[in-house]
A protein has these predicted regions:
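A short, charge-rich alpha-helical start-of-domain segment used by transcription regulators
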Residues: 1-17, 27-30, 41
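Acidic, proline/glycine-rich intrinsically disordered inter-domain spacer in sigma factors
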Residues: 2, 75, 83-110
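Structural recognition of an alpha-helix C-terminal capping motif at a helix-to-coil junction
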Residues: 31-38, 42, 51-63
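Helix-turn-helix DNA-binding module
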Residues: 110, 114, 125-142, 156
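DNA-recognition helix of helix-turn-helix
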Residues: 62, 136-160
Length: 161
C-alpha cells in the first residue's frame, strides 16, 4: 500500500506546480495543495494498481484544481510570481531574463482555457499521452489534439507579448 508520505515525497513539487498553474495567490495555492493532498489520502485505499499511481495522483490534483477554480470564479486576481520562478541564479541579468520568460509562460498557461491548461501542465510534468489520457479521462488522440492546440495558442500569446 502506498503511503501519503511517499506520494508527497515523489509528487509534492509537481502538485505545487499544478496548483500554481491554477492559482496565483500564494495562500490559496498552498490551500489547494493541501486540499489535493487530503483528497489523495482519502482516495489511496481505492488505488488498485500501484504502477498507475502517477496518473491517479494527477487526476485527483486536476479534479481538485478545477473545483478550486470554479469556487474562486469572480475573485479578483493578484499578481504574484510563482515560487518556482524565485530562483537565485547565475548572473543577475540572465536570471532576470529567465525569470521574465518563465513568468510570461506561466501567465500564458494560466490564460489558456481549462482543457488546454490541463493537458499542458501534465505535459510539463513529463506525463506520456497515455498517462494524460488516463488522468483526464480522454482518448490519446484527443490529448494529442488538445496539446497541439494549446501549444499553438501559447505560441501566439508569447509572440504577441
Amino acid at each position: 500500500m502506498v503511503s501519503l508520505e511517499q506520494v508527497i515525497a515523489d509528487y509534492g513539487p509537481a502538485l505545487a506546480r499544478i496548483a500554481g498553474a491554477y492559482e496565483r495567490d500564494r495562500a490559496l495555492r498552498d490551500d489547494l495543495v493541501q486540499d489535493i493532498c487530503v483528497a489523495v489520502w482519502k482516495a489511496l485505499p481505492s488505488l488498485k494498481d500501484e504502477a498507475r499511481l502517477k496518473p491517479f495522483v494527477f487526476r485527483i490534483a486536476h479534479n481538485r484544481a478545477v473545483s478550486h477554480v470554479a469556487r474562486q470564479a469572480g475573485r479578483p486576481g493578484q499578481d504574484e510570481l510563482s515560487d518556482s520562478l524565485r530562483d537565485g541564479g547565475l548572473d543577475p541579468e540572465q536570471s532576470l531574463s529567465d525569470r521574465q520568460r518563465a513568468e510570461r509562460l506561466v501567465e500564458a498557461v494560466r490564460r489558456l482555457s481549462l482543457p488546454y491548461r490541463q493537458v499542458i501542465t501534465l505535459v510539463l510534468e513529463d506525463l506520456s499521452y497515455e498517462e494524460i489520457a488516463e488522468a483526464l479521462g480522454l482518448t490519446v488522440n484527443n490529448v494529442g489534439v488538445r496539446i497541439n492546440r494549446a501549444k499553438a495558442q501559447l505560441k501566439a500569446m508569447l509572440s504577441d507579448a
